[in-house]
């Protein structure tokens, strides 16, 4: 399995002032939510207008298919698609594995071994894994119990 370093992503950006603060604090990635049901949703054209010269741009996608994701990525000037829903390996491959961040919730797995098997399954179909706390959703700032078991 590929090994990656940790990186910091500030997600839910909707304003230039928040993006500028994230860049100033050394974040590596900024996340834009493209799930219409989210209170932090941003239109792709609005995300494109935000200046992020010093930080890598990520779109968070929940239910969109590969074609919709690729269209939004182009419009919003995104480098990465964070797959936050029930996306398939085929969807990730169509987007391009080098552009995909796969979200996993360690607390959903019965063991660290089960989580590692899922990561191995996805390893060739994504550039990064994002290990989110809790068992669903995101952005709640809770530490996951399996992270220590993974040696993280």
Regions from the language model: what does each represent?
Residues 1-152:
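Conserved N-terminal beta1-alpha1 strand-loop-helix module at the mouth
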């Amino acid at each position: 399995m590929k090994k990656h370093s940790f990186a910091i992503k500030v997600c839910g950006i909707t304003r230039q002032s928040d993006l500028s603060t994230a860049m100033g604090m050394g974040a590596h990635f900024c996340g834009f939510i493209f799930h219409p049901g989210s209170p932090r949703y941003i239109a792709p054209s609005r995300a494109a207008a935000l200046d992020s010269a010093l930080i890598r741009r990520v779109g968070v996608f929940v239910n969109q298919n590969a074609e919709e994701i690729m269209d939004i990525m182009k419009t919003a000037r995104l480098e990465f698609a964070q797959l936050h829903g029930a996306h398939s390996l085929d969807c990730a491959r169509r987007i391009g594995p080098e552009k995909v961040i796969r979200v996993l919730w360690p607390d959903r797995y019965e063991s660290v071994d089960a989580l590692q098997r899922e990561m191995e399954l996805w390893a060739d179909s994504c550039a990064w894994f994002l290990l989110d706390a809790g068992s669903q959703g995101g952005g709640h700032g809770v530490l996951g119990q399996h992270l220590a078991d993974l040696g993280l």
